[in-house]
Structures are given as structure tokens and as C-alpha cells.
């Protein structure tokens, strides 16, 4: 049910841009939300705090869970006003409302060097396959009975059902995500994962439909720490871009305890600032998705000078879209049975929405169609998937191309396969992280068209959820080859040997799009120079003209090495002060400072990025960097959605505050008269991140269309979003 509701966020929400009608004055608030009960995570300043004494003043608050490994804190439940008061207690470091997390190889394993590295041996003369390395997976569970996973699975726990059986959800709201992730890491049968002999420990923190709470994910991290896993994979996340959320902090702690943590960067790209927690963790390895070079299908229409090629994206799990496929195209509206009466032996063009992809494909097949093209109901392209293979091929295309096809009504379309180079996937979330401007992702790996294990067999899926386990498998191989390596050394080896990718215009992607580039495992295993950190952020907190960043360089080789930083290319208004060349003896390390001076009069924007080059003899090593001259102008409020709630006649909303707000509110105005109708919600000192609430029907205005003014105030600045929402309590 939870997954269905999350999906419905985009299916049933009726949100339209509404033209501004002059300045709207928001009336003062009458307090009415303080009694709402919420769940939150409270972190303590000191380890010796008496938890019972802290909560004595707040009788409505009760302890739900105690965290002592991943975090020093508790999860609590109680009235919002008491939780707000608790934030002021000197013994409390932070209080964060619990949010929802969503579970967001055949050719990809050799592509990243997985096959090549199996030809190498460790000091025990063992082939590099991940043998003896414990990999934890926090996800929807695992089908440990799958023939390709039986040998790899060693144990785990079901946090959702509180037992030692982390099997995937079956029946209604069934899941497959965790099994797919596990196969990429360590399948050992018909398919072979990156590290086929690694030991898999599965922690089921995401329940039916593939969603779970902060609390359950934290419990899973605690268990993984207790089980002393070597590598921990989290192919999950939410849309909260902040470095200090509980899950991100817990991963930082796990890394400090010696666990190499890997997190997916999110599937909300291609815009900046779309990375979500736990991909925002400072010390974990955050992974974006690339599309390996391949021949990809395009449909062509027209003749001569009017000929046009349109990229299409085969739907994962559907019957393959074959090369040189052609046929007559007809408009099938949204794909309902009554709209497909002329579909026999035709390719049907249908619009996304109202019914599922599987239903559209099944309806077209029943009507005798030869294939289905589903175009987006908003701008841009998208990737789709179905869990049951249909009878006919199906693919997606962008909203713009779909509308154009519908308008021009071409008689025939033809399919051609075009070779495309390796690119960053459009859906892959971009950084940087708000607040600290850290570069994310750290690295990218294949995440498009990844075939792996699922409970019913095998399925090809897309997502950074598929990219992250490539890196987790790579970490397992590196740990087997070099068991003495720390998580920081594993991260450095992967990042300093990554290959930098270029876009279709042959320009290098920004560092906040690709991090250090795409992983090259066969190079990473040979690394013996390490950099801490492996990317640099220069932040101007006090409007200084000179910014600095520190870095430690370590030579773990058996001989002395000479290093030299090269000067970056000319940048107007920027002067770099690089360290002098230096030599490190074997097993020696050195701390360095890099400075840059800037003239704001010659700089047009607030964020700049690039790569520093270090020469180790004749070998080039690249370090991503980013500097912020002023606080970037990211939106103070974003991501507003308004949808039906969990209970009948209730509604729920969500919005995102990148930096928190001194005041946040949602004011409603009648659409026709623009008369003030009341506040949908209001909050003082709202925390940074995602806010999601259900509004009871008695708190809602009468049925009708309303203009919603969503605003956030902070440090004398106010940002607003204006949307039209529809309330219908009769549904």
C-alpha cells in the first residue's frame, strides 16, 4: 500500500502552475497543529546522557527504539509541540522527524573491469571473487532460495516482521528490489555478479511495496555493525538533500567503525541539488548511474529532408524492441480498451497516466496491436518497467516527441539502432549537497538495462539502485585483494582511478554530475597512493577573498614517489596557490593546503567546479573540486505535492526545505475569488529536509479548486511556490 501511495504521488496529484495574480498577503496564523503526533529521531550531545531524565518534562513522549552503534540517540513518538520543545534541551544535539525511504550485469560486470580482475590473485593466492568478504544489503529482503543466490546468502534479519527470515514480500505488494541488488553484487549461477563468492547478509528494512521508515533503516544499520559486515549497500533513499539527516550520519559512523558504505545517489535527475539521503553521507561512497556504450533504438519518421529520428527507451521487463522493426502508427489515446478498436497489426501510441504500463500493454495486445509506444504526460523522457513480460514490445519516449507524433500522424515508423557513447543517465540525481556543498555523487557505475536476479527469475532494471551494487561488489573485491585497506582507502582507490565522462556535446560532465567519473576496477586494485578526502570543496563562509582546503596524501607503496600538482587552466578572477612538488617515502603521508583567491567582480555565478591534476611520475591522478564564492541560490522551498491520504477523505502533502525555515506555511485561496480560505499547514523553525503530513478531513476546506501559496522564510528572505490544488472529499 505504501508503495502504491508513493507512486500515486505522481499519478493522482492535480498540481498545475498557476499564474500570479499580484502580491498575496498571507494572514497571521491561528495555532492548531501543535497536538499532532509524530515520530522523530533525537540525538544526544554526550554518550552518558540519562535518557529517562531527558524525557521527564514531556509526558507525551515515549521511547520507541534506542540506538547505540550507528548513532547515539533514540526514536521517540509524541505530540509535535513537545518534540519542538525537546529541541531546545541542551543535552540534545538534534531532533529530526522520521521520513519515508523508497527502494529506488551480464555486460556491465566486464565493462567496469569485474571479469578482468578475476584473473588476479591476492596474497593468499586466491582468485579475486569476493571470497571471505561480508556484504550487507539493506533493502526489501532477498529471495535466498533463488538458484543464483543460494551459495552467496549467509544470513540476515527482517526488521519489518521482527524475525530472522528476510525473504522478499510475496503476494499483494510483492517486492523484488533487494534480490535484484543482491544478484548484481554476488549472483553465482547462471548469472555472475561483480563478486560472486562474497557473503551476503540481507536486512529487510523496506516492507510491502518497497518502502520503510528512518527508524527501520537505522535498526538495519545497527544490525550490520553488530554483524561486522565489511561492505554495506543501501540502494534506497528519499528526496531530502541534507548532510545531517540520521541515516547519513549513521553511515558516517559506520565508516568510522571500519565498514565501507555505499549508497545510491537517487533517481531525481537531471537537475542540480537532486541528490537525496543517504547519498548525502559525507563518508559513504555515493553512486550515480551511467549508460554503457551500446546500440540503442530510434524510431524514424518522414522522408528526405523531413526525416526525423526519435530516441525510444524499451520498457524493462517487456518483450524486446527489435532492430529494424517497422509498422503503421495509430493514436490510442491513454490505452483504454475502447480506444484501441483500430489497433490490429498497428503500433499504438498512448499517453502515460490513468492506468499502469502493464494495463496499457495488455490492452493493446488484446486488441491485436504489434507494439506500444508510451509517451510522457509531462516534459522529458522517462524509463518504465513491468514485472510480468507482455505479449508485445513496448517502449517509452518523451512528452514533446509524443505530442509531435500525435500531431503529425506519420503513416509508418521504422526502427534503427544507433551506437551511443557512455553517458550519465538523465534520471541520475545530481549534487552538490546543500549546506556543505560537498560533491555528490562520488563516482558512477552502469545503471541502465541491468539484468539481474528477481524472485521469479531475472529482470532488466534501471536506476542508481542498480549502479550502487556494482560499487559494493567492487569494494568486496578490493577488500579481498587488500584486507588491510580502510574504507577511506577503498573510496580513494575507486575515485582516483575513475574515467571522466563527456556528454553528447563532447564536454566533460560537471563534478556534481559524475563525481570522479565511471569506476575502473582493474585500475583501482593497483592503487598505492591515497588522497583523503578524494574530492575537495572550497566554501566561503565569511566572504573571504582567499579560500583553502586541506588534503592528506599517503604513499603505501614499497618505494619513494615524487608528486607534482599542475596549475588548473586559466579561470577569470581566480588565482590558485598549489603546493610545491614533493617526495613521499614508502609508507609516508603528508598534509597539504591548497588555496585559491577570487575576484567576485569577474565571476558570474556562485558555484564553480573542475578537476585538479597531480602527477605521480608520469601517471596522472585527478581530484574533483568545487568552490562556492557565495551561498548558492538554491530554492528555499521545493518539491510540493498534494495527493489523497492514507485514510478516506484525508489528504497528504509533502514539500522540501533545503535549509530549513524560520517560518513555513501553506496558505489557501479560493481559485475564482482569490479569497483567503485558511492555512493548510504552518510551522515555526521547520527543519531542513522533506516534510510529509496527512491532513484530516475536518481540517480541510470545502470541496473545490484552490490556489496554494507555499512559502518559507529564512534570514530575511522569503521564497514562494504557487500551485492549484483540487480537494474532493466525495472520492
Where are these regions (language model features)?
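Autoinhibitory propeptides
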Residues: 4-33, 48-124, 401-411
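N-terminal domain-start motif of subtilase-like serine proteases
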Residues: 21-34, 63-66, 77-85, 103-137, ...
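Flexible, small-residue-rich helix->loop connector segments that border functional cores
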Residues: 117, 125, 138-148, 172, ...
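Acidic-leg catalytic submotif of subtilisin-like serine proteases
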Residues: 117-165, 180, 184, 235, ...
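Beta-sheet-dominated interaction scaffolds and their linkers
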Residues: 136, 263, 423-429, 518-557, ...
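Subtilisin-like peptidase catalytic core
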Residues: 162-240, 288-293, 336, 346-357
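Hydrolase catalytic cores
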Residues: 182-185, 194, 201, 205-207, ...
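Structured lumen-facing ectodomains of secretory-pathway proteins
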Residues: 274-276, 280-441, 455
Amino acid at each position: 500500500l505504501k508503495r502504491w501511495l508513493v507512486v500515486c504521488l505522481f499519478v493522482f496529484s492535480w498540481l498545475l502552475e498557476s499564474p500570479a495574480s499580484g502580491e498575496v498577503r498571507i494572514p497571521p496564523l491561528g495555532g492548531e497543529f501543535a497536538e499532532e503526533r509524530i515520530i522523530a529521531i533525537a540525538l544526544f550531545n554526550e554518550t552518558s546522557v540519562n535518557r529517562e531524565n531527558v524525557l521527564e518534562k514531556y509526558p507525551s513522549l515515549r521511547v520507541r527504539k534506542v540506538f547505540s552503534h550507528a548513532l547515539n540517540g533514540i526514536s521517540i513518538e509524541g505530540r509535535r509541540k513537545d518534540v519542538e520543545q525537546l529541541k531546545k534541551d541542551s543535552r540534545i544535539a538534534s531532533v529530526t522527524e522520521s521520513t519515508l525511504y523508497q527502494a529506488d550485469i551480464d555486460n556491465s560486470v566486464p565493462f567496469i573491469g569485474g571479469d578482468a580482475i578475476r584473473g588476479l590473485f591476492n596474497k593468499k593466492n586466491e582468485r579475486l571473487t569476493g571470497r571471505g568478504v561480508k556484504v550487507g544489503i539493506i533493502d526489501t529482503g532477498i529471495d535466498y532460495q533463488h538458484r543464483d543466490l543460494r551459495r552467496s546468502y549467509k544470513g540476515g534479519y527482517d526488521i519489518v516482521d521482527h524475525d530472522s527470515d528476510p525473504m522478499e514480500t510475496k503476494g499483494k505488494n510483492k517486492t523484488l528490489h533487494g534480490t535484484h541488488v543482491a544478484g548484481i553484487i554476488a549472483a553465482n549461477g547462471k548469472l555472475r555478479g561483480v563478486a560472486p563468492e562474497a557473503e551476503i547478509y540481507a536486512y529487510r528494512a523496506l516492507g510491502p511495496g518497497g518502502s520503510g521508515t528512518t527508524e527501520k533503516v537505522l535498526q538495519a544499520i545497527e544490525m550490520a555493525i553488530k554483524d561486522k559486515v565489511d561492505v554495506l549497500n543501501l540502494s534506497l533513499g528519499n528526496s531530502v538533500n541534507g548532510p545531517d539527516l540520521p541515516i547519513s550520519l549513521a553511515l558516517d559512523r559506520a565508516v568510522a567503525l571500519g565498514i565501507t558504505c555505499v549508497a545510491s545517489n537517487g533517481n531525481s535527475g537531471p537537475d542540480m541539488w537532486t541528490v537525496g539521503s543517504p547519498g548525502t553521507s559525507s563518508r559513504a561512497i555515493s553512486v550515480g548511474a551511467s549508460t554503457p556504450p551500446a546500440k540503442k533504438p530510434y524510431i524514424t519518421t518522414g522522408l528526405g529532408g523531413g526525416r526525423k529520428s526519435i530516441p525510444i527507451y524499451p520498457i524493462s521487463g517487456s518483450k524486446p524492441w527489435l532492430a529494424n522493426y517497422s509498422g503503421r502508427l495509430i493514436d490510442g489515446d491513454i490505452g483504454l480498451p475502447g480506444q484501441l478498436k483500430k489497433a490490429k497489426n498497428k503500433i499504438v501510441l498512448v499517453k502515460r497516466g490513468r492506468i499502469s504500463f502493464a494495463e496499457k500493454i495488455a490492452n493493446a495486445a488484446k486488441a491485436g496491436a504489434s507494439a506500444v509506444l508510451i509517451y510522457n504526460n509531462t516534459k522529458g523522457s522517462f524509463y518504465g518497467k513491468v514485472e510480468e513480460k507482455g505479449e508485445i514490445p513496448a517502449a517509452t519516449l518523451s512528452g514533446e516527441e509524443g505530442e509531435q507524433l500525435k500531431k503529425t500522424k506519420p503513416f509508418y515508423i521504422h526502427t534503427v539502432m544507433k551506437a551511443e557513447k557512455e553517458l550519465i543517465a538523465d534520471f541520475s540525481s545530481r549534487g552538490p549537497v546543500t549546506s556543505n556543498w560537498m560533491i555528490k555523487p562520488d563516482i558512477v557505475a552502469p545503471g541502465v538495462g541491468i539484468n539481474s536476479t528477481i524472485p521469479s527469475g531475472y529482470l532488466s532494471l534501471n536506476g542508481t539502485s542498480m549502479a550502487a551494487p556494482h560499487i559494493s561488489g567492487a569494494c568486496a573485491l578490493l577488500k579481498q585483494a587488500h584486507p588491510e585497506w580502510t574504507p577511506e582507502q577503498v573510496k580513494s582507490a575507486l575515485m582516483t582511478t575513475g574515467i571522466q565522462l563527456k556528454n553528447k556535446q563532447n564536454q566533460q560532465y560537471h563534478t556534481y554530475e559524475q563525481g570522479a567519473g565511471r569506476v575502473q576496477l582493474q585500475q583501482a586494485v593497483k592503487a598505492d597512493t591515497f588522497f583523503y578526502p578524494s574530492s575537495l570543496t572550497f566554501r566561503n563562509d565569511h566572504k573571504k577573498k582567499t579560500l583553502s582546503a586541506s588534503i592528506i596524501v599517503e604513499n603505501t607503496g614499497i618505494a619513494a614517489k615524487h608528486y607534482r600538482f599542475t596549475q588548473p587552466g586559466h579561470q577569470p578572477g581566480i588565482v590558485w596557490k598549489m603546493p610545491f612538488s614533493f617526495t613521499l617515502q614508502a609508507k609516508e603521508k603528508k598534509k597539504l593546503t591548497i588555496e585559491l583567491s577570487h575576484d567576485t567582480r569577474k565571476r558570474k555565478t556562485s558555484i564553480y567546479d573542475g578537476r585538479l591534476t597531480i602527477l605521480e611520475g608520469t601517471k596522472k591522478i585527478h581530484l574533483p573540486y568545487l568552490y562556492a564564492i557565495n551561498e548558492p541560490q538554491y530554492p528555499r522551498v521545493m518539491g510540493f505535492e498534494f495527493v489523497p491520504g492514507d485514510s478516506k477523505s484525508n489528504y497528504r502533502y509533502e514539500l522540501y526545505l533545503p535549509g530549513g525555515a524560520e517560518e513555513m506555511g501553506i496558505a489557501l485561496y479560493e481559485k475564482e475569488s482569490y479569497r483567503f480560505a485558511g492555512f493548510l499547514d504552518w510551522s515555526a523553525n521547520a527543519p531542513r529536509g522533506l516534510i510529509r503530513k496527512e491532513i484530516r478531513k475536518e481540517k480541510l476546506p470545502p470541496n473545490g479548486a484552490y490556489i496554494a501559496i507555499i512559502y518559507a522564510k529564512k534570514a530575511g528572505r522569503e521564497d514562494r511556490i504557487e500551485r492549484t490544488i483540487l480537494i474532493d472529499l466525495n472520492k
